[in-house]
Structures are given as C-alpha cells and as structure tokens.
From Swiss-Prot:
GO terms for biological process: transsulfuration. InterPro entries: Cys/Met-Metab_PyrdxlP-dep_enz (IPR000277), PyrdxlP-dep_Trfase (IPR015424), PyrdxlP-dep_Trfase_major (IPR015421), PyrdxlP-dep_Trfase_small (IPR015422), Trans-sulfuration_enzymes (IPR051750). Its EC number is 5.1.1.1. This is Alanine racemase ungC'. It comes from Aspergillus campestris (strain IBT 28561). It catalyses: L-alanine = D-alanine. Keywords: Isomerase, Pyridoxal phosphate. Gene3D superfamilies: Aspartate Aminotransferase, domain 1, Type I PLP-dependent aspartate aminotransferase-like (Major domain). The gene is ungC'. Pathway: Secondary metabolite biosynthesis. Transmembrane segments: none annotated.
Length: 584
C-alpha cells in the first residue's frame, strides 16, 4: 500500500476522488510553494491554491467556445469559473481595483463576464439520478488578460467562491453527452450586479441542504459557560457555502453592505482571512490581545471613536483557537466590549470544531470550514455561517445576508458532506483523545535540554487555556446512547530551536504533508513557509506567544493508532536531534 513517504510533489491522497490532500513532501517544497514557485509543477493541489484538472479542462473548453463566437482583444486570455454572477462580478472588480492601486490600470474591456449554459433541460441520462429532472448548470466565466493572472488567482484563493471539481466533472459529462458544447453569452456589468441575475445557478432545493442545515443547527445548541440563551439556532440561521473562505468573504461583504466601517481582528488570524479583511473595506485594526493591557487599549480606542464615524469599528473578528498558535482570546470580554459599542463579534471555530466549542454565547456570527472536521475525509470543500438568533442585530443581518447570498455548494458536494458528517462526534472524540495523548508525550521532549523541540502549542497548554475552557461544550448524550465528550481539538503545533532542526524533522516525518487539517489521516505543514511568510516576515521576538515562529510545524491528528503516530514523530525527532547542539 502506498504510504505518505512514497508520494511526490503534487500527488493526491491515493484512491480518493476529489482529494483536498495533496502531498508537498519536503521543507524546500513548502518554501517553494509559499513563494509561488511550486504550484506550476503541481497537477493537483488544495482546491483554492491549485486549480483542479477537471476545472482546467472545463475552462479550456469554455474559453475555446468564447474565442470562436466572440471578438476579444484581451492579450493572452485565461478564465475563472463561478456558479454565481455576483461572485464573477466581484472577481472582475477585484482585478480592476488592484491594477488601479498599482498605478497600472488594466482596461476594463479586457475583463469580461460571460454566462455559460451547460446541457439541456435533462441534466442526466439516468432517470434515477438526482440530476435527472434538473436543468443543466449555468456558470459564470471571468475572462482576463495574462497580466492579471496573479490578481485573479488571489481572488480565487482568498475569497473561495470558485466552482468545485465535482461540479466541473458534472459539466464535462454533460458537454460530452450533448456534443454541441456550452452556450456562452457576454454580460454587461450592470446585469451581473443586478439582483435577479445575481442569484446562484445552483439550486438548494434538494433535501440534503435542509438536512445539513438542520444538523449544523443542532450542533449549535448552547452549553458553554454563561447565561442560557433564549432562542436556539434554527436551520434558517445556517448559511452554506462552497468553502470556508467563501463563508468568510460573504459574511464580511454582507456586514460592509449593512454597516460601513473598520474591522478589528484580535489574536492571530488565518492568513487568507486576514487578506480578505485587509483588501475588502475601509481598513483593519490589529490587536494581539495577549494581556489585559492589550484589551484595555482596544477598549480605549473604541471609546474614542465617534458613533457615526465612517471609519468606526463595526465588527471584531477572532478564532477559537487561533491557527496555528492555538491560543484563545478572552471572548467574554470581547462580547462585553461589543455590547457596549454595538459591534458584531464574528468567530471562526474551524480549528476546534463545533463538537468541542460553543461560541453562541459570545458571537453574533460563527463561521466554520466544514471541509475540516465536520467532513473529516478531506474530499469535499464546504463552509457555513451561523447567525446567532439571540444577537440584537440578528434580523438586520439575516435580511442582508439573504439578499446577497449565492449558493456555491454543488449538490454532489452537499451529498458527500452529509454522508461524511454522520459520524462527526465519534470521530472528533477519538481525535481529541489521541491528540491530548501525543501532546502529553511530546512535552517530555520539550523538557529535555538536549532535544531540538522547544515548545508545544495546544489549547490545553499555556495561559489562554482558561479562555478556551470557558467555551468548551458540556458532555452530551446522543440519541443512540454514547456520551460525546468535548476536548481540545486535533491540531497542535511544534516549535524547534532553529530552522535546521525543524526542516530535518519535517523531511523525516512519515505523514501526509499539505495545506489542510481536520482529516482522517495526520497532516503536517511548516505554517510560515506554507503561507509564504518565512524569514521575510518581521516578528517582534522569537517564540512570542502570539505569533507563529518560522520554526513552527502545524500537526493535524487523524484516526491512526496513537502509538503509530507517536512512533513516526519519534523517528523524525531522532533525525532532528542528530544535528542539534544544545546552546550553552
């Protein structure tokens, strides 16, 4: 059987269709990937980073059709595909805005949006198939010149609304069946921004969508410390998306449409989330919130802002816990500040998973990457946003999000997600226990001065543990009997004494290595190198508790036996130790 060490750069998880897990096997490969030098060598990759082969094939077919039927003077054209017109228009606007900001504006007519109709009224020849009575999909293609390729890719990567590989596969199947190819129509900007054409072409009437919304709403019951909530989350409070970043992007844009203002992020944020907040809207304030003094500073800043200032803060963003340093901010104090100044708290629970933490008592909106633990098999992209029915802003937010919502979760992806998530609580409990065991064992190496391993980062470790534990769910007995016990999650990070020790450890670590986490197999990644930051990013001081070190390796625990995982880690540590000289 093929193991992780047998995989080369760009090889997907063996035997799993639509895998999100694609191997980036060495430290040098991760550095090259983060610098944008490895993606061209990879036929496969994480869907937001490397366009899937089926999507590329469909794009080539559509591009050829556009060029055969429409005059276009865009030099060296390429295209991206979206399931909604608003997403396509947002991509065009993003490319134009960035080019103007650099003082090298791209002519607007070089970037065009096309409506692409795939298939006829019967989308599938099999009468028993769930596509048999539905119309073929309508996609939206953004055609752009080669000079805009990096900006277009940045939108695809950070905003997350592109089509999935399953949707591309379905469209290619229809194109082959029909033989005539897709039908394309150029759209004016006014049309793509309009409310009637803005709706997604992907219907969400299939029962699987209600099943998923209901399942997620059931997990959002309130059991953490704090006052009981008057209303529990309903299925209608759950919005589904084609990725976690698509959820973040839509929530942020909806908040800006509802109330213009500056966003604040507290603690470390996932790098793509940070880029969305920085590039969309009037500005972003950053707070580390490592100490009470930091919170006091934020409180003072909020007290000084004017109530009707266009640059006043409108929302506070945070993660519970943060990725990849696994620290948790004082969410109860943030909630108090938000109530005092009529702000929103938007919290991302993707790293812990909502089987472990309950943020309904502190957040107006909870965002989750369903691609991670909820799915648990790294073979489908999805995300969700839950609106807290007890928020004073719930009605206004719900109206705004409903108006601008485009379903980007294809039905085949939704079906796979529903199947994968049936055993979510049991999987999460197993991973919690394994991860806590590994952390306990590895702490012994941290205590050894001869070990290159200097620190373990995990929610159960360090001074922010108390804040995480305030958000932990209480144990809950499910309908079929087993008691679901929350824990500290399946992600921990390791810091090493130097880059040489970290890179040697990583290169000798026999696990899957890639961009994702929260799967049924272990996944490791040097976070700073993976995200293109590395040594070039200035950090206040080594091993600062609120920043990711360039020696940090994030480790996501899977369902493998705990002793097997520990042995693999020990083998890599032994290799790292051979070249390590303890200071002093």
């Amino acid at each position: 059987m093929t193991g992780p060490q047998d995989l080369r750069l760009g090889d997907p998880y063996p035997g799993r269709a639509h895998s999100l897990l694609v191997q980036i096997p060495t430290w040098a490969d991760m550095v090259a990937f983060g610098q944008g030098k490895a993606a061209e060598q990879m036929k496969n990759g994480y869907p937001r980073s490397v366009v899937h082969p089926d999507i590329r094939s469909l794009g080539s077919t559509i591009l050829a059709k556009i060029q055969s039927e429409h005059s276009d003077d865009s030099p060296d054209p390429s295209l991206l595909l979206f399931s909604g017109a608003r997403a396509a228009q947002s991509c065009k606007d993003y490319i134009l805005l960035l080019s103007q900001g650099r003082g090298q504006p791209i002519p607007a007519h070089w970037i065009q949006v096309y409506r692409v109709s795939i298939g006829g009224s019967s989308a599938c020849g099999d009468p028993q198939h769930h596509h048999s009575r539905s119309a073929g999909p309508t996609l939206y293609a953004v055609l752009y010149p080669g000079a805009a390729a990096s900006d277009a890719h940045a939108f695809w990567q950070r905003m997350g609304p592109g089509i999935s590989s399953r949707l591309a596969q379905h469209c290619l199947r229809l194109v082959r069946q029909e033989g005539s190819g897709p039908r394309v129509e150029a759209l004016l900007a006014a049309s793509t921004a309009g409310s009637t054409l803005g709706a997604s072409s992907l219907p969400d009437s299939h029962p699987v969508y209600d099943e998923l919304r209901g399942r997620i709403a059931a997990y959002a019951y309130h059991t953490a410390d704090g006052p009981e909530l008057i209303q529990q989350v309903a299925a209608s409070d759950v919005f589904l998306y084609g990725s976690g970043m698509a959820a973040i992007y839509h929530v942020h844009r909806s908040i800006l449409a509802w109330r213009t203002g500056v966003a604040v992020h507290v603690g470390l944020l996932y790098e793509p989330t940070l880029r969305v907040l920085q590039t969309q809207g009037p500005g972003l304030w950053s707070y580390s919130l490592r100490t009470e003094a930091d919170l006091d500073h934020l409180a003072a800043q909020l007290a000084r802002q004017g109530s009707y200032d266009a640059r006043a803060v409108h929302a506070i963003w945070c993660e519970c816990p943060s990725n990849p340093i696994l620290q948790t901010v004082d969410l109860h104090r943030l909630r108090a500040l938000a109530d005092q100044h009529s702000l929103l708290v938007v919290a991302d629970d993707s790293v812990a998973g909502f089987a472990n933490v309950d943020l309904m008592g502190v957040a107006d909106i909870v965002i989750s990457s369903l691609s991670k633990y909820f799915s648990g098999h790294a073979d489908v992209m999805a995300g969700s946003a839950i609106l807290n029915p007890n928020s004073r802003h719930h009605a206004a937010l719900h109206r705004q999000m409903a108006v601008t919502y485009e379903n980007s979760l294809f039905v085949d992806d939704a079906i796979r997600l529903e199947l994968n998530s049936r055993d979510f609580p049991a999987r999460m409990a197993h991973i919690n226990a394994t991860t806590q065991y590994l952390v306990t064992q590895l702490e012994r190496h941290v205590a050894d001065p001869a070990s290159p391993l200097t620190r373990i980062l995990y929610p159960s470790q360090g001074p922010s543990r108390v804040y995480y534990e305030r958000q932990m769910r209480r144990p809950r007995r499910s309908d079929d009997g087993p008691l679901s016990r929350p824990g500290y999650g399946g992600v921990f990070s390791m810091e090493f004494a130097d880059v040489a020790g970290a890179s040697t450890f990583f290169d000798h670590l026999d696990v899957y290595k890639g961009l994702s986490f929260g799967a049924d197999v272990c996944i490791a990644a040097p976070y700073m190198q993976m995200t293109g930051q590395g040594a070039a990013t200035q950090r206040p001081q080594p091993h600062d508790s609120n920043y990711a070190s360039e020696t940090l390796i994030r480790f996501s625990v899977g369902l493998e036996p705990a002793e097997d995982i520990l042995q693999r880690v020990h083998t890599a540590l032994e290799a790292s130790s051979r070249g390590f000289v303890a200071p002093g």
